Amino acid sequence: MHATGLAAPAGTPRLRKWPSKRRVPVSQPGMADPHQFFDDTSSAPSRGYGGQPSPGSLGYPTSSSEAAFLAAPMSNMAMAYGSSLAAQGKELVDKNIDRFIPVSKLKYYFAVDTVYVGKKLGLLVFPYLHQDWEVQYQQDTPVAPRFDINAPDLYIPAMAFITYILVAGLALGTQDRMIGGVLTGLLFGKIGYYLVLAWCCVSIFVFMIRTLRLKILAQAAAEGVPVRGARNQLRMYLTMAVAAAQPVLMYWLTFHLVR
């Protein structure tokens, strides 16, 4: 007896159940989980439709490059403006000072160097062997003192005055009082003082006569005045009077230091 009902008829093939091939969605870095309520912002910023691309990725300059680009012209402009203000201020100061003190002319008398100062001091102390006393000119303008030992200068007189004050103050300070002191007398007494004073007086007299005499003669020749004219003779007498007054001034400034 054949079973009926669930039995399959003869000749009919049986169906086999294969496992389900449904693909499980894999979460990608750029896609959000459908079961997640909020986006995960802890990872790198997304570049999808909602993300904004960075300016540098599109070829536009970033904020740092823009600052560097703008800083260079601004600094150059500020530097140029400051330099122009400094130049204008210097020019204004020079104009105001030149009204009272000819600074441009005074610069000539201070254009000296160490070699010139050494040679000029030697000439002041030993003027007897010097032969050429003429001042050198270049295009009708006297050369700077550092190029000509005969050129006049104000550096040595200024430094001599400052040195006198310093040495006199030192000598007075050794006496523990500000009246009465000694300079040369500290070492050699009055005899040494008078010997040095006599030598300096004669040297400065010879130096001034030889230097100023040529200056007066050159000026007289330029003006067309006769050398033995009354005006030129008056200049020579005044020069000799100024030279003769130097020893008197030297003694008056130093005699109280050897009392």
UniProtKB/Swiss-Prot annotation:
Q: Hey, which stretches end up on the Extracellular side? A: 175-186, 259
Q: How does it sit in the membrane?
A: Multi-pass membrane protein
Q: Which residues cross the membrane?
A: 154-174, 187-207, 238-258
Tree of life domain: Eukaryota
Biological process according to GO = cilium assembly; endoplasmic reticulum to Golgi vesicle-mediated transport; protein targeting to membrane; protein transport; sperm flagellum assembly
* Sites bearing Phosphothreonine, chain numbering: T12
Intracellular or extracellular location(s): Endoplasmic reticulum membrane; Golgi apparatus membrane; Endoplasmic reticulum-Golgi intermediate compartment membrane
Answer yes or no on keyword Electron transport.
Answer: no
Q: Which residues lie on this side of the membrane: Cytoplasmic?
A: 9-153, 208-237
| Tissues and organs where the protein is expressed, per its UniProt entry | Highly expressed in brain. Expressed in heart, kidney, and lung and lower levels in spleen, muscle, and intestine (at protein level). Expressed in serotoninergic neurons (at protein level).
Look up the record and report any one GO term of the cellular component aspect. endoplasmic reticulum membrane
Q: What is its main location?
A: endoplasmic reticulum
Q: Which residues carry this modification: N-acetylmethionine?
A: M1
Q: Which UniProt keywords apply?
A: Acetylation, Endoplasmic reticulum, Golgi apparatus, Membrane, Phosphoprotein, Protein transport, Transmembrane, Transmembrane helix, Transport
What spans are recorded as compositionally biased (Basic residues)?
Answer: 14-24
Q: Which family is this sequence assigned to?
A: Belongs to the YIF1 family.
What is this protein for, i.e. what is its function? Functions in endoplasmic reticulum to Golgi vesicle-mediated transport and regulates the proper organization of the endoplasmic reticulum and the Golgi. Plays a key role in targeting to neuronal dendrites receptors such as HTR1A. Plays also a role in primary cilium and sperm flagellum assembly probably through protein transport to these compartments.
Q: Subunit composition?
A: Interacts with HTR1A (via C-terminus). Interacts with ABCB9 (via TMD0); this interaction allows (but is not essential) the ER-to-Golgi trafficking and strongly depends on a salt bridge within TMD0.
Instruction: Kindly provide the name given to this protein in its UniProt entry.
Output: Protein YIF1B
Query: Which source organism?
Result: Rattus norvegicus (Rat)
Q: What are the leading ranks of the lineage? A: Eukaryota, Metazoa, Chordata, Craniata, Vertebrata
The gene from which this protein is expressed is Yif1b
